[in-house]
Amino acid sequence: IYIFTHDSIGLGEDGPTHQAVEQLSSLRLVPGLDVWRPADTQETAAAWREAILSQERPIAFALSRQTLKEIPKTKRQISNISRGGYVVYGDGSDPDAIIIATGSEVSISVSAAEQLKLKGVNIRVISMPCQEVYERQTLAYKNKCIPKNFDNILAVESGIGDSWHKFVGKKGAMISMESF
């Protein structure tokens, strides 16, 4: 188990000592490494459980140095954290758009979806604390989260966005930090 802090450009209690835009992208390039970037304490606990149970793969945690808002979840959502990605916000109907986020950007994405709902825009938010674990899920599960051929996808992460192209496709977009 490897633990990394300073997971993004976010400022924490220790000030602007380093803003790691490259850390997540670099870690995700390591073959066989599962990289977890949890959004809150429930996701952190689920990631720890997976790390303890894992006997075959190394695990890296990319933890925020900021205080993160706890995101309300159902029991089903909590159990789906271990799948690496799950629907954290959305009523289950056909969304107008899907936002995929990790870490501190999940609560921001949920807040944006709540504001857009007031304007009649239906947004599904996927929290994806671990891309590698999510990619090992069944096609049926992945299609429940992000339907195949769905074009209106936005990935949000405060780091280099290279690893999100495979999820947003050619018509999707990313909000990421490529330099600072």
Task: Describe each PLM feature range.
Residues I1-I3, A101:
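A short, small-residue-rich loop immediately preceding and capping a beta-strand
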Residues I3-T5, A39, I123-M128:
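Beta-strand segments within the central parallel beta-sheet cores of soluble alpha/beta enzyme folds
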Residues G10-A20, L53-F180:
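Thiamine diphosphate
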